[in-house]
């Protein structure tokens, strides 16, 4: 009989429920965990014991126990935490459970101890349950016991450790920045925290450590990282959280290639430790190439359905919508070919207009090329034979294809077709195997905010313009490019970064272009501008969305599945009831009252 191997001298168990194998047969073990299932077969009782590492089957036989063990087994119920002692033995060939890593063995239990009891759980603690997400979030501490959720947390822990080690091994210094800072809105609203000691003044929870990490570069840290909590009080979309985690990185005395190459090393190392190969150097795709080809600045390049420019074909078309766009400066006529969707029923195709409207379209023009060679479309009657022939050739049309069009401003047309491309890939269940990594670079420096009637920073107001575009910023801001790079993984923006402005005068000019008065710029960012005057070095950085990357690595549908205690889409914590009211006394302490 082998010796019991303690996994931790400060633990009640000697083995976990996920590690015992055939080679452990004959070993005495002590296990702890929760009763997952219990089956009474008359003279024998079987119990599946679960801990964070897995499940082991226990066998209770009155002839091989201390007398109380079998009696305890008769009373045990799901989710009771217990401690047992026993001997590992092999299961018979006919009783081996191939679904479990421990399926070749069981533990013949000679002693059992109930550590606590449990009320009946609101759902079964196992994978594949059909319980609503709200119920799972209400009882999140139970949901976390499920193997799938525990595996997600384990992967997140392992990946965080891997990227920390990869950074540490490359001389990056982990530095913590404050969670109570000055309110400097970066696009979303700040979560503000009233000061009790200074009535009427407020801290803000940081949307990112952006300004602080730039100050660390001024301070000489040179290579910084932090696994940082970030907070944004924005209108929540389906898969956004008011607080999230990013791996925040900054470097100084570097150019853009230095930063990107260092990041590739770090990311390739960290992903490699997770068993995911990330070939380096990564592809670099220009922003406009991504938009014009895929309709997205975060393209999934694992499948085709590329956007195709048809502007020249319809310059003289009798279909006025296309002809107008083809002859208007800055507008285009483009299309995608969804192969296989041409066989869809007319009613199903008509519903795609509603999908397109969510991406900004006022309607959706389409042509269905049926398998029998016929054509179904409300617009084809306006096309000449020459236009149809050119369309067929350029779109590589085959029977069964569905061609969908967008006509109008270039960027809007790209975004509409990019959204439809993604929708159709899901609807047609196009396979996307493996992981897809690339950089998207050279984003515009600004975009026009139609609501505010003002320029807005495409990334953030501290981004360095490309050297060749500095001179044109004031004359034509929308034509200026930026020293930016987004890390794209499987069609998601997994991270983003850029080079920073390290000159105080240029930073002030940038803020003025964004509508800041000099007084407002000094009020919000004066401390940064002052720091830049003290020999600020060239600097650039990056932030990796830890939640998003872990979602992709686990194959989860939502970032909520890789967070221990997430909020709902409305920002609520269903478990604790947050956000909640506070007492009048608490409000009085910080000189506030409810209106």
Task: Indicate where each model-derived feature is located.
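Class II aminoacyl-tRNA synthetase catalytic cores and aaRS-like
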Residues: 1-595
């Amino acid at each position: 009989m082998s010796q019991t191997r303690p996994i931790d001298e400060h633990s009640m168990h000697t083995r976990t429920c996920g590690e015992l194998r055939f080679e452990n047969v004959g070993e005495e073990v002590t296990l702890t965990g929760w009763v997952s299932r219990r089956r009474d077969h008359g003279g024998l009782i079987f119990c599946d014991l679960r801990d964070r590492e897995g499940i082991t089957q226990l066998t209770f036989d009155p002839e091989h126990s201390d007398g109380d063990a079998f009696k305890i087994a008769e009373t045990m119920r799901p989710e009771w935490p217990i401690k047992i002692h026993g001997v590992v033995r092999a299961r018979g060939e006919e009783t081996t459970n191939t679904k479990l890593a421990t399926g070749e063995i069981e533990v013949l239990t000679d002693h059992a101890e109930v550590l606590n009891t449990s009320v009946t759980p609101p759902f079964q603690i196992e994978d594949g349950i059909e319980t609503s997400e709200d119920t799972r979030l209400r009882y999140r501490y139970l949901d976390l016991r499920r193997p799938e959720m525990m595996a997600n947390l384990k992967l997140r822990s392992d990946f965080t450790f891997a990227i920390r080690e990869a950074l540490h091994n490359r001389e990056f210094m982990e530095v913590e920045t404050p969670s109570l800072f000055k309110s400097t809105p970066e696009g979303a609203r700040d979560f503000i925290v009233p000061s009790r000691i200074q009535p009427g003044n407020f801290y803000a929870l940081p949307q990112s450590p952006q300004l602080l990490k730039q100050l660390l570069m001024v301070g000489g840290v040179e290579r910084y990282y932090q696994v940082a909590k970030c907070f944004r009080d924005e209108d929540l979309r389906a898969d956004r959280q008011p607080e999230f985690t990013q791996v925040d990185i900054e470097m100084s005395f570097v150019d853009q290639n230095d930063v990107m190459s260092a990041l590739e090393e770090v990311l390739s190392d960290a992903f490699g430790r997770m068993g995911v190969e990330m070939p380096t150097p990564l592809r670099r795709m220009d922003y406009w190439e991504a938009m014009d080809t895929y309709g997205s600045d975060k393209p999934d390049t694992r499948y085709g359905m590329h956007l195709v420019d048809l502007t020249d074909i319809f310059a003289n078309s009798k279909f006025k919508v296309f002809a107008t766009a083809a002859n208007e400066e800055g507008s285009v006529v483009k299309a995608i070919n969804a192969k296989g969707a041409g066989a869809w029923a007319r009613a199903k195709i008509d519903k795609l207009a509603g999908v397109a409207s969510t991406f900004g379209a006022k309607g959706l023009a389409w042509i269905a090329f049926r398998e029998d060679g016929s054509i179904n479309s409300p617009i084809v009657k306006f096309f000449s034979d020459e236009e149809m022939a050119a369309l067929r050739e350029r779109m590589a049309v085959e029977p069964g294809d569905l061609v969908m069009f967008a006509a109008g401003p270039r960027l809007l047309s790209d975004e509409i077709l990019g959204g439809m491309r993604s929708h159709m890939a899901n609807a047609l269940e196009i396979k996307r195997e493996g992981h897809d990594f690339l950089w998207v670079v050279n984003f515009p420096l600004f975009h026009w905010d139609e609501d505010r009637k003002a320029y807005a920073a495409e990334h953030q107001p501290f981004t360095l313009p490309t050297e060749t575009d500095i001179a044109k910023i004031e004359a034509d801001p929308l034509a200026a490019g930026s020293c930016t790079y987004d890390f794209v993984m499987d069609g998601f923006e997994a991270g983003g970064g850029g080079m920073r402005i390290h000159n105080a005068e240029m930073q002030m000019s940038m803020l003025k272009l964004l509508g800041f008065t000099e007084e407002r710029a000094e009020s919000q960012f004066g401390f940064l501008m002052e720091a830049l005057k003290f020999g600020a070095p060239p600097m650039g950085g990056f932030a990796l969305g830890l939640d998003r990357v872990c979602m992709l690595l686990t194959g989860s549908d939502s970032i909520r599945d890789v967070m221990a205690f997430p909020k709902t889409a409305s920002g609520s914590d269903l478990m604790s009831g947050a956000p909640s009211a506070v007492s009048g006394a608490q409000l009085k302490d910080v000189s506030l009252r409810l209106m």
